[in-house]
């Protein structure tokens, strides 16, 4: 086990720029024929939008990996732990009242417990830079940030979504993995839960462990 501490900066102007562009991306992706196609287009657009804005945080991970002589697996675990340490914050694309009225039992129970949420976000997902700026993220906001950082670190990664589970996790293409995986163009991507601490590569909640209930949206292989 190793401890990590890092400091990075974000700006309100860059954050607001991402918010403004996000509306256009969401409207464009909404023409998709299916929810999987929508999220694939939307996630890809959000990544491209923020690709240049996350260089500072990527450099922190890259420098740390070099200094500590980490392999790809260890570097991925470092990124995963960083995201897991950020407290959970439900993000949804409507008001809290509408989210409760149309949401599943998790959403209803979450609001009934007066837990924190971030309403009126297009598609119910924040972009990588937006999340780094305000630290408000649920499942797919976290998965997209993990994908964005790992992609820039040249580590194979993917964002998984499940209509059956109403959930999203990160996939990472590593050597000698264990646990749940999906093969993406010949490379095994191991799933990992990012909304709670302690999950390692290949580990998800028991109720979410059927790989056939997961679809791959954006991905990259190196």
Annotate each language-model stretch with its function.
Residues 1-222:
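A structural boundary/capping signal
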């Amino acid at each position: 086990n190793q401890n990590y501490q890092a400091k990075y900066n974000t700006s309100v102007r860059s954050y607001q720029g991402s918010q403004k562009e996000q509306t256009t991306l969401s409207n464009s992706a909404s023409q998709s024929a299916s929810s999987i196609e929508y999220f694939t287009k939307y996630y890809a657009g959000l990544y491209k939008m923020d690709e240049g804005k996350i260089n500072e945080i990527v450099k922190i991970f890259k420098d740390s990996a070099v200094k500590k002589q980490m392999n790809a697996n260890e570097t991925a675990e470092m990124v995963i732990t960083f995201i897991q340490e950020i407290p959970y914050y439900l993000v949804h694309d409507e008001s809290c009242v509408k989210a409760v009225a149309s949401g599943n039992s998790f959403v209803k129970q979450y609001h009934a417990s007066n837990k924190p949420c971030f309403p009126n976000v297009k598609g119910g997902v924040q972009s990588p830079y937006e999340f780094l700026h305000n630290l408000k993220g649920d499942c797919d906001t976290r998965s997209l940030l993990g994908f964005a950082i790992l992609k820039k670190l040249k580590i194979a990664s993917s964002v998984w979504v499940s209509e059956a589970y109403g959930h999203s996790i990160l996939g990472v293409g590593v050597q000698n993995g264990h646990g749940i995986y999906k093969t993406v163009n010949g490379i095994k991507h191991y799933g990992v839960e990012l909304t709670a601490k302690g999950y390692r590569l290949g580990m998800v909640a028991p109720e979410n462990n059927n790989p056939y209930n997961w679809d791959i949206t954006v991905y990259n292989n190196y």
